[in-house]
């Protein structure tokens, strides 16, 4: 009888310890999820910034990587990548370097094509067109004979100019992950075609699928902030061996090189 009571007491204590441990883990995971969301919110709060020249007066996260007196450089990058059945993968996008020290901006419009040759080796070719920004307008700095391409560059709008994120907490049922060894972190959400940002992308790009995308937010570096780390977001419409359709955007603040 006494032995039975001791056994029940021991089992009770074991179950209690497991329950407390599980609650502690859940609380720790919930705290980490909140920290990851807060980290992404700092970047998402920049959307929209319709006038890119506003970045001259925007301060970003600073650490010991910045030299004294360096105001830093914003790196803004938007590109669309499309690969459909039987066709090569092509990405078209623009990257800008917004120098807060000189209040000047330069960059490149980049067209990249990837494919596999008959032996299965990956091949690629890339063409860069240098640009500058003045009065919130993109201006090619070298002559472009192709009128259609020149107009595409001059009319280019970055996602930060029209994208709008009220709050990442508005997105439900997200898959949030954290790898402390890298460190890296991410959050993935299934969107609908009625989502404001999805509508904006479809308005500006000929996206050859009606499938609603997933939103993937990715980052690496210290969650508390790091100029070495990098953050970007992707709208993934299709991702498999035969087809890939996704839009990538990033805004990062770095020491001026």
Swiss-Prot record:
Residues bearing a lipid moiety (S-diacylglycerol cysteine): 23
Localization per Swiss-Prot or TrEMBL: Cell membrane
Signal peptide span: 1-22
Keyword Lyase: no
Cellular-component GO terms for this entry: plasma membrane
Highest taxon of the lineage: Bacteria
TM region(s), chain numbering: none
Membrane topology term: Lipid-anchor
Keywords per UniProt: Cell membrane, Lipoprotein, Membrane, Palmitate, Signal
Family: Belongs to the staphylococcal tandem lipoprotein family.
Protein name: Uncharacterized lipoprotein SA2275
Species of origin: Staphylococcus aureus (strain N315)
Biological classification of the source: Bacteria, Bacillati, Bacillota, Bacilli, Bacillales
